[in-house]
């Protein structure tokens, strides 16, 4: 595993690369990358995983003027150009799924498959319906109950973390709120453009996700032409962390079956 800093269109970006073979660009969740969890090692056995820390997370500073999800979509298109990616798979989880969808409605040129893992970013319900749980307002215990099939697996003992890690967690949460504060965690215009995604698309969903439910995933399936929705049992909002083997197996079967 290697970590380096890149300059993309004047923005500094911390980038993790792991594995060899066909490129796979992974856009992380609002909780961050968590490269120490098994998902990354498992995925790197199949692909050359390219995993940037979004601006505001890790050691990636915020974009000048703070930036928007639109900026992130264009930033990662520039990253793909700079790295010369060809026939790559694009994977986005949670907040990263929103960014991945925004990227793909703009250009699918460098990517041959799209995998969205419990993405945010779209409102399918009525004005007074909450499609996406208010993660920032929930008490920690309630958030864990909604986000994980087994809440104990998501628990972090903050008292044992060094100050540098605590500061990074706070920065990431501030950035997450910044990008999705209003309107809350979605782009009202994105739904109308999802038909532009003309690559095979898999929606992987934790069967016990109570941040965005599988019914919300069905809305995504209907909005993207030809998309498939598959549920991962015993997983909540982060199936790549909670059930990494099942996540990698499903992803690999889809990507290799749609080359």
Name what the model sees in each region:
Residues 9-61:
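Conserved HGGG/HGGXW glycine-rich cap/lid loop of the alpha/beta-hydrolase fold
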Residues 50-91, 249:
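Active-site loop/oxyanion-hole signature of alpha/beta-hydrolase fold enzymes
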Residues 92, 96, 100:
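Gly/Ala-rich beta-loop-alpha elbow adjacent to hydrolase catalytic centers
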Residues 101-106, 111-142:
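Flexible "cap/lid" loop of the alpha/beta hydrolase fold
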Residues 163-192, 196:
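Hydrophobic, aromatic-rich cap/lid helix
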Residues 197, 203-205:
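Short beta-strand/loop motif that positions the catalytic acidic residue
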Residues 208-212:
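Acidic catalytic loop of the alpha/beta-hydrolase fold
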Residues 227-259:
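Catalytic active-site module of serine/aspartate enzymes centered on a nucleophile-bearing elbow/loop
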